[in-house]
């Protein structure tokens, strides 16, 4: 049985993916900062970690300690009008955060 990390797993799409993976008996770890997600959407059979993809040390720890085999990355900020006003926030989360996630997979 695979252990799968879902970033943004407490959001609408992420929580539905978690449900499906849990239903087919995968071990699921959710990483979500709850900026737009809701803890109430988290399946209790999944392991929930409140944290941020901008924290590369946390990402590396999660991947190593949970022996993550697969990652589904859904932790993104999406509001276009807000992105125009807060470019740095969106850059840090969507670009740097994704880069951190990729780098954390390196051995």
Model-derived regions, located:
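N-terminal Rossmann-like NAD(P)+-binding domain of SDR-like oxidoreductases, especially those catalyzing
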Residues: 1-107
């Amino acid at each position: 049985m695979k252990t799968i990390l879902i970033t943004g797993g407490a959001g609408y799409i992420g929580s539905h993916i978690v449900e499906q993976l849990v239903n087919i008996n995968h071990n699921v770890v959710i990483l979500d900062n709850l900026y737009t997600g809701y803890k109430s959407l988290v399946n209790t059979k999944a392991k929930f970690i409140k944290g941020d993809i901008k924290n590369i040390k946390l990402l590396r720890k999660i991947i190593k300690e949970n022996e993550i085999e697969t990652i589904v990355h859904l932790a993104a900020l999406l509001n276009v009008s807000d992105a125009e006003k807060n470019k740095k926030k969106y850059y840090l989360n969507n670009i740097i955060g994704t880069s951190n996630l990729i780098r954390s997979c390196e051995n």
